[in-house]
Amino acid sequence: MTSSENSSVSNPLRTDVLIVGAGPVGLFAAFEAGVIGLSCQIVDGIERPGGQCIELYPDKPIYDIPAVPSCTARDLVDRLVEQCRPFNPPMHLGQRIERLDPLEGGRWLARTDKGHTFDAAAILIAAGNGAFVPQRLALDEAARLEGRYVHYRVSDMNGLAGTNVVVAGGGDSALDWALALRSVARHVTLVHRRSGFSATDSSVARLRQAVAAGEMDFVVGTIARLNSPVGPLESIEVRQIGGSVCLDADQLLVLYGLVADLGPIVNWGIAIQAGRIVVDTSYYESSRPGIFAAGDIACYPNKQKLILCGFHEASLALRKAYNYAFPDKKRVHVHSSYDAKLAERVAAVHP
């Protein structure tokens, strides 16, 4: 469902609803949009669907999804993606909406940071707590070296081949990448502020086994200085209790996790309270007609940050969005059990 469609300011992709966010609520919204006869496009800053479920706790259990006694966040996302398949909603991943401008007739023109544009009758913001951005290393020299010697993600592991790599962090991503890079790097050292980790038991066990076998090093401490006297990174000073240690390093991979950031949403002219979008409780519409919010980003009295609540909010929001997409057409409600068109679509992908 990942889209390769291109668009420009002069030739935007036209859709009934633009869904901002590909987390569980955004994915269910895409399915629900198809059920009631709305076309949609999905945009998300992360390069894979799933939102914070995938980025923060992919293997943690979830117990409060109706009729699903237990599943991991990864399982839930996989099921929601599968549920969308009958409508094949295009997903524009790895980019975020930078601008949102009103058009004549009540429609909206949205622009992403990659130059893609969308002409939508309604906007449904299901962005969780906002876009996720890497938590950066708080050293002045880190900003100067970012992109060449300091990295917050790995786009091509072979780009680190033959180098001394220091990986900073203690979560699943840090441990998994430190272990994976053994196959291409000259040497790998993992640096974490304490001896314990916030990673799965299996990842921790693999790490300790690799260190014991001499396949990589693990150093407890915090990065205090990046040494690059003639340009390239040469070494990293790690502060420890009672002293410090200097590590040879050509490349630094910082995996301190992700932090939520509303980003450009705050500039869209919609009412925001405590970092969330204020909505009514009839259709979860914001202070600007045609812009809706569902999921954790929605703010209203007695709001519960539950995935199932987000499903409900998105469902109602889309029914109001239908009126913006088809102002002269009355929507006829049909229970899914008696929806022949839906049954045909589902049968086509799940024979």
UniProtKB/Swiss-Prot annotation:
InterPro entries reported in the protein's UniProt record: FAD/NAD-bd_sf (IPR036188), FAD/NAD-binding_dom (IPR023753), Fd--NADP_Rdtase_type_2 (IPR022890), Ferredoxin-NADP_redctase_2 (IPR050097)
User: Broadest EC class?
Assistant: oxidoreductase
Q: What is its EC number?
A: 1.18.1.2
Q: Which cofactor does it need?
A: FAD
What catalytic reaction does the record list? Answer: 2 reduced [2Fe-2S]-[ferredoxin] + NADP(+) + H(+) = 2 oxidized [2Fe-2S]-[ferredoxin] + NADPH
Quote one Gene Ontology molecular function term.
Answer: NADP binding
Could you list this entry's UniProt keywords, alphabetically sorted.
Answer: FAD, Flavoprotein, NADP, Oxidoreductase
Stored Pfam families: Pyr_redox_2
Regions annotated as coiled coil: none
Question: How is the cofactor bound here?
Answer: Binds 1 FAD per subunit.
Please indicate if the UniProt record lists NADP as a keyword: yes
Keyword presence, Repeat: no
Q: Which residues are noted in the entry as FAD-binding?
A: D44, Q52, Y57, I97, F132, D296, S337
**Complex formation:** Homodimer.
* Family assignment from sequence similarity: Belongs to the ferredoxin--NADP reductase type 2 family.
Indicate what this protein is called per its UniProt record.
Answer: Ferredoxin--NADP reductase
Species of origin: Burkholderia vietnamiensis (strain G4 / LMG 22486)
Q: Taxonomic lineage per UniProt?
A: Bacteria, Pseudomonadati, Pseudomonadota, Betaproteobacteria, Burkholderiales
